[in-house]
């Protein structure tokens, strides 16, 4: 086991505080509409230019191991905030730095760190209640666009696209962000359920211009196993032909004689038919086929469930208004499923999302919810250079998360003003002792930090602006750093999602409390490089 170096008490906290300051000072310059850029060196390719706080935080690694511990704990604030709300990482970092600085001073002055932590927790709980009581629900398309525009650092095109995407696929829908191959940013939406399996044979194509299979009002056969011959299906196929409706077959695979028979029937015009492979693999495939069955009011034909192909009747097939298949994807539009059944299935998948520990599983489950409950939208981000595209993609990702958060918990005035206005809620707060009261005062001072930093990044005197704002009583009245005006921030579109502000404060206080109550640091000593022994000399 390698030898360790141990630091105690104020020496430990001072080292960590240096690391916290290094990381926070690099991150906080990006805060606000007039935030500065940070240029990050890459081991290959062009350097990366960003205004995204979490991207900067993730790149910082310090040489001194003890300082690095402080920086890494602060990086944890940014990462947590990014995972929970997708935005507000810089605000969380600024708040954490302010709480740690004040807390370290208080501990150095002889106060009890545990009581300080209790005071901080008490104050944060009170502020969170105040924020929740002032949050305004978001529903209008224009308000959603405003939130998205702010999170994308004032890019109105992104705001408009995101509002449009959420309008089309709903809050549950999947919105993915990709890099475009062109200069323009564009939005593509898919209504209904789409899965990444194309037609099994180009002979199924009905629209030769677009090379797509388009089936109007088809029956849908959902089969779990491979189909290699159609003998068992002949009675069912005859019923489908008599109904005059097309047929879509979804199975693990359709091969050999079965595929040849279907193609021949399609070409002769006897049966309008198409076949695709089932989506997913293993247990996920079974679950996705069940999703398709519920969406289309059909049954999965599976021997595990006791149904055999020869016993399938036309009533066991799914129905949909339209099915569109290209060489890569199948889209089922407007399935005939019962809304109550679909809602029950969505609730069931949501329960699985709550309990799963795997990020990959969670992502796949969320996609399934979206396909059942909403739709899928893809925003393709364009730009003149690779660096520009990457930077814009970061901003669109931020804006997407922030917009979702706004719809979830409502909005507050932006520019750090909601935290400033929350100072009033701490006025009547009484602590059990003086040290806890100091904890409350630490939060009181920290709440001013984001508004001050936004003003300073815009080239203004932060302390003066915060003082001026605290003179007024109007909750929404604040300093618009983009224009340099004092105005009603909600009316002028400077808004923050309540969830972003709330989680920023909670995560910052959580990590800052850990740093304040740290009494010892342990790190490995660097290994001494022993020179290699000289080879023996042969005389």
UniProtKB/Swiss-Prot annotation:
Keyword Cell membrane carried by entry: no
Matching InterPro entries: Chaperonin_Cpn60_CS, Cpn60/GroEL, Cpn60/GroEL/TCP-1, GroEL-like_apical_dom_sf, GROEL-like_equatorial_sf, TCP-1-like_intermed_sf
Pfam family, any one: Cpn60_TCP1
One GO CC term, this protein: cytoplasm
Location (main, coarse): cytoplasm
GO molecular function: ATP binding; ATP-dependent protein folding chaperone; isomerase activity; unfolded protein binding
An annotated GO BP: protein refolding
Keywords attached to this entry: ATP-binding, Chaperone, Cytoplasm, Isomerase, Nucleotide-binding
Location(s) in or outside the cell: Cytoplasm
Catalytic activity: ATP + H2O + a folded polypeptide = ADP + phosphate + an unfolded polypeptide
EC number: 5.6.1.7
Function description: Together with its co-chaperonin GroES, plays an essential role in assisting protein folding. The GroEL-GroES system forms a nano-cage that allows encapsulation of the non-native substrate proteins and provides a physical environment optimized to promote and accelerate protein folding.
Subunit field text: Forms a cylinder of 14 subunits composed of two heptameric rings stacked back-to-back. Interacts with the co-chaperonin GroES.
Entry's family note: Belongs to the chaperonin (HSP60) family.
Name of the protein in question: Chaperonin GroEL 1
């Amino acid at each position: 086991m390698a030898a360790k170096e141990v630091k105690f008490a104020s020496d430990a906290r001072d080292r960590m505080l240096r690391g916290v300051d290094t990381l926070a000072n690099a991150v906080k310059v990006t805060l606000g509409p007039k935030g500065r850029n940070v240029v990050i060196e890459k081991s290959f390719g062009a350097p990366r230019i960003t205004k995204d706080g979490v991207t900067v935080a993730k790149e910082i690694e310090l040489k001194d191991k003890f300082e690095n511990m402080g920086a890494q704990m602060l990086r944890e604030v940014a990462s947590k905030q990014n995972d929970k709300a997708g935005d507000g990482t810089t605000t969380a970092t600024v708040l954490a730095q302010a709480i740690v600085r004040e807390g370290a001073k208080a501990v150095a002055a002889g106060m009890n760190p545990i009581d300080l932590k209790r005071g901080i927790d008490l104050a944060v709980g009170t502020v969170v209640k105040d924020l929740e009581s002032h949050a305004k629900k978001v529903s209008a398309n224009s308000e959603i666009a405003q939130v998205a525009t702010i999170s994308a650092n004032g890019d109105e095109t992104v705001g408009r696209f995101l509002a449009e995407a959420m309008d089309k696929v709903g809050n549950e829908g999947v919105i993915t962000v990709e890099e475009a191959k062109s200069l323009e940013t564009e939005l593509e939406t898919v209504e209904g359920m789409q899965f990444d399996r194309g037609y099994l044979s180009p002979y199924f194509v009905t629209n030769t211009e677009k090379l797509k299979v388009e089936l109007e009002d088809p029956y849908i056969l959902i089969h779990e196993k491979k189909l290699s011959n159609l003998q068992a299906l002949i009675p069912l196929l005859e019923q489908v032909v008599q109904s005059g409706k097309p047929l879509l077959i979804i199975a693990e695979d359709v091969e050999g004689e079965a595929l040849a028979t279907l193609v021949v029937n399609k070409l002769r015009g006897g049966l309008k038919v198409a076949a695709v492979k089932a989506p997913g693999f293993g247990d996920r495939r079974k679950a996705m086929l069940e999703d398709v069955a519920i969406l289309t009011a059909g049954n999965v034909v599976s021997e595990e469930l006791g149904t055999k192909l020869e016993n399938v009747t036309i009533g066991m097939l799914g129905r949909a208004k339209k099915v569109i298949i290209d060489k890569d994807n199948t889209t089922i539009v407007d399935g005939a499923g019962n809304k109550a059944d679909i809602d029950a299935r969505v609730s069931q998948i949501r329960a699985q999302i709550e309990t799963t520990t795997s990020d990959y599983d969670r992502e796949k489950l969320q996609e399934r919810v979206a396909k059942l409950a909403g739709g899928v939208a893809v925003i393709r981000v364009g730009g003149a250079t690779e660096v520009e595209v990457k930077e814009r993609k970061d901003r669109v990702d931020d804006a997407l998360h922030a917009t979702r958060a706004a719809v979830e918990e409502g909005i507050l005035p932006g520019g750090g003003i909601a935290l400033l206005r929350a100072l009033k809620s701490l006025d009547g707060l009484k602590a059990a002792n003086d040290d806890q009261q100091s904890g409350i005062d630490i939060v009181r001072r920290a709440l001013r930090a984001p508004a001050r930093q936004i003003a300073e990044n815009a080239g203004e005197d932060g302390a003066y602006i915060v003082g001026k704002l605290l003179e007024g009583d109007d909750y929404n009245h604040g300093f618009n750093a983009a224009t340099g005006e004092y105005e009603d921030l909600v009316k002028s579109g400077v808004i923050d999602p309540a969830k972003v502000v709330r989680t920023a404060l909670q995560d910052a206080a959580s990590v800052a409390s850990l740093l304040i109550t740290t009494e010892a640091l342990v790190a490995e000593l660097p290994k001494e490089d022993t020179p290699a022994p000289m080879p023996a000399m042969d005389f």
